Amino acid sequence: MAEISTDVLVIGGGNAAMCAALSACEQGASVIVLERASVEEAGGNSAFTAGNIRTVFNDVDDIRALCPDLSDDEVAMTDFGTYTEDEFYDDMGRLTEYKTDPDMCELLVTKSLDTMKWVRSKGVRFLPIYGKQAFKIDGKFKFWGGLVVSAVGGGPGLVESLTEACNKNDIKIMYGARATSLIHDDDGVHGANVRVREDGEERGTTIKIAARAVVMAAGGFQANPEMRTRYLGPGWDLAKVRGTRFNTGDGINMALEAGARAYGNWSGCHAVGWDYNAPEFGDLDVGDNFQKH
């Protein structure tokens, strides 16, 4: 079996994975990213989103820091409002029925604006969501709900910008590369065994990637009918998947097999009304237009 090594191995190819790779690179680490999908289908569920990202902001200057292309005229005709830490906390509690992890929630809320500025520094551009999050009242756009900005180009644009940033920083992205198991012992996780697709088939060459640290960012199990039925209940095997067909729970299963502790809400999910005639999995050309709510 061929073997290569790196400082940090990131399993997954969506927003979280790319940001983890860029952060590790900032600290001087060599990084390899494993993306199970092909170049054309890369990006995980991030590529299927609208690219809208919620963040704390206290005034228009915070918005302009994220959207420096905003003109003075656009600012003058817009009431962005504010979205405070307290409001973000309240929304997280209300929408999760207070099941949200308090420590993770605090990190998300208090670091949200700094994180957005960091993502902006990596080349991701943001614009206000005038079309969906603002109403025009007496000649002035008024935003509601605390959600104000979206990545230019939506989810696909977000993935494209982060991929460009990785390429500029010599982060190696391996496409068609599926991690099959973690390499671990009593001292921790030291890499992964990886099957590399050949000629479009996942039955390919298996290689070993040794790493000083492994970041698991491989998404959930929504594209796995068996796991949906096991954790969500009867009938969920028939559900149509809004996003990528590659999120089959591999990362979760590998982590559990390596001794990780199961945590969180396994019997709940986010689901919406979806077109009866939609394909089994998401279609990047159609995006979220199969949605019926």
Residue ranges of each PLM-predicted region?
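Glycine-rich, N-terminal phosphate-binding loop of Rossmann-like dinucleotide-binding domains
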Residues: G13, F57, A218-G219
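Conserved redox-cofactor binding core of oxidoreductases
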Residues: P102-T205, N224-M227, D275-N277
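Glycine-rich loop(s) and the adjacent beta-strand/alpha-helix scaffold that form part
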Residues: G200-G204, I209-F281
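Beta1/beta-strand and adjacent pyrophosphate-binding region of the FAD-binding site
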Residues: A2-A16, I32
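Glycine-rich FAD pyrophosphate-binding loop
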Residues: E26-S46
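FAD cofactor-binding and catalytic pocket of flavoenzymes
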Residues: A24, D275-H293
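N-terminal glycine-rich dinucleotide-binding loop that anchors FAD/FMN and/or NAD(P) in oxidoreductases
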Residues: A47-E85
